[in-house]
Amino acid sequence: MLYWLLYLKLFHYFPPFRIFRYLTFRTAFASLTALFTGLIVGPIVIRRLRDFQIGQYIREEGPQAHQKKAGTPTMGGLLIAIAILVPTLLWADLSNPFVWIAMFSTLAFGAIGFADDYLKVVHHRNLGLTARAKLGFQVAASIMIAIALIVLQHSGEYSTRLMVPFFKQFHPDLVIERWAVHPQLWPLAFLPFVAFVVLVIVGSSNAVNLTDGLDGLAIGCTVIAAGALAVLTYLSGHATFATYLELQRMPQIGELTIFCGAMVGSAIGFLWYNAHPAEIFMGDVGSLALGGAIGTVAVMIKQELLLPFIGGVFVIEALSVILQVGSYKLRKKRIFKMAPIHHHFELLGWSESKVIVRFWIASLVFALFALTTLKLR
């Protein structure tokens, strides 16, 4: 909005507005706007949630130290969504389709999480949405994102080819080209791409959701992952850097740097109130929205295969649950004392703060390694 008004419309009359053309300037101010939105609106949201008695339910089989958190205001992801979307609308070029896809993902997955939280907290249904319903909505939202990207691929603004870490020239296409030209088979040509997009986005959304079990854990890791994605979006949209690093350059993709910057700022603002001991929890409305946004950005900048490194802690948390459930069903034995794995370390005697900070450190190491792979090819 400000880009359109102050740069495209008014900079001819007031040359200093030319600064709004610079992506780095708008990203920095999007981050700051998101941060201060979170800091200012946070107390209002916390107070309102308390007034409506929207508090967190703590399961009895969890660590006993967590029982004192019962009743802490939840559904704070509403604050995160506001702090992401408002700065993006203010500072991004709203003629850019990738920006709208990222915002759609945040809203769609946030709405799924909101419905889940609403049923659990307001209607006192312990499980919220059924697993089948939640997964169905997530898949539907991801398919819509995939279709939008296919449309952009037809117009030459997007590529369905994968960037494979550690390989310079290996870029397999997820569209079956010989079927794409067939009048009857062409819809099937895009099935591998659509399935892959669904896997990445739904997996990312649920992985962040599983990580959200300790004060500040998921949101701290989100700051790091979103920061790494901001670097990658900037490099992918910059002609010189993309050529030098042999990235798939898509000129319009750089505008997503502003969205990622807003995600970083909103996450830091939320962390101010979510740090141990937390004054507010994000709930599914926050974790699903953030995970969906992270997965969607990774798909759009062609770094889907790098996402397991960028969000390494999220992947480990999700794998710990999969392994625990699989082991118990197959062998009637548990691998961990409790899953997700952050609870395992709590039951080993680590304090909550120690688990959180060490997982943040691990997340930072994973993200730095992901960025170094750009040259390790």
Language-model features: where?
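Alpha-helical transmembrane segments within multi-pass membrane transporters and channels
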Residues: A111-Y118
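Membrane-interface helix-loop junction between the first two transmembrane segments
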Residues: P43-E61
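Alpha-helical transmembrane segments
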Residues: L2-V45, I80-A111, I145-Q169, F190-R377
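Short juxtamembrane and helix-loop transition motifs at transmembrane-helix boundaries
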Residues: E61-K69, I101, H124, R178-W186, ...
